[in-house]
Regions:
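Short S/T/G/P-rich N-terminal loop/turn motif that feeds into the first structured element of a domain
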Residues: 1-77, 83-93, 108-127
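Amphipathic protein-protein interaction modules
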Residues: 88, 96-102
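Hydrophobic small-molecule pocket/channel-lining residues, especially in calycin-type beta-barrels
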Residues: 104-106
Length: 127
């Protein structure tokens, strides 16, 4: 399935001190397992995830110039894209059923989230 306008996505960005990255890595392990166990990559049974990607990079003093040095933080981005609101809603329901993982997400979001785009429409895509 292709990502197209009208789909619905999530993108959450975190800025984590380098000495705390193991907490994020542990969460990402459990989140990836959750995604693999409960989501589909094809078919009609929601949630069908069109994109699940996690990005990680040191935070640079100047992001356009890596030679500027690092800030001592690591940046993470989690991106998920679904066909429409039904898939996004199914994802949220399933995620909240995993109370421990969901509580960890809330804790990490409260501490380290710097940007969150939640359940937003895809407004541009390569068709």
């Amino acid at each position: 399935m292709k990502i197209k306008t009208g789909g619905v996505g999530f993108h959450v960005a975190f800025k984590v001190p380098n000495n705390k990255t193991q907490i994020m890595e542990s969460f990402l392990d459990s989140h990836e397992n959750f995604m693999r166990e409960t989501h589909h990559i094809e078919g009609t049974v929601e949630p069908v995830v069109l994109c699940y990607a996690v990005l990680k990079s040191p935070e640079f003093n100047n992001p356009l110039d890596p030679s500027s040095g690092e800030t001592g933080h690591t940046l993470y981005g989690i991106t998920e894209i679904y066909n429409g609101p039904e898939g996004a809603q199914a994802h949220m329901v399933l995620g909240q059923e995993r109370a421990e993982m969901f509580a960890e997400l809330v804790k990490l979001t409260n501490e380290y989230c710097v940007s969150g785009i939640l359940g937003a429409p895809i407004i541009r895509a390569m068709h």
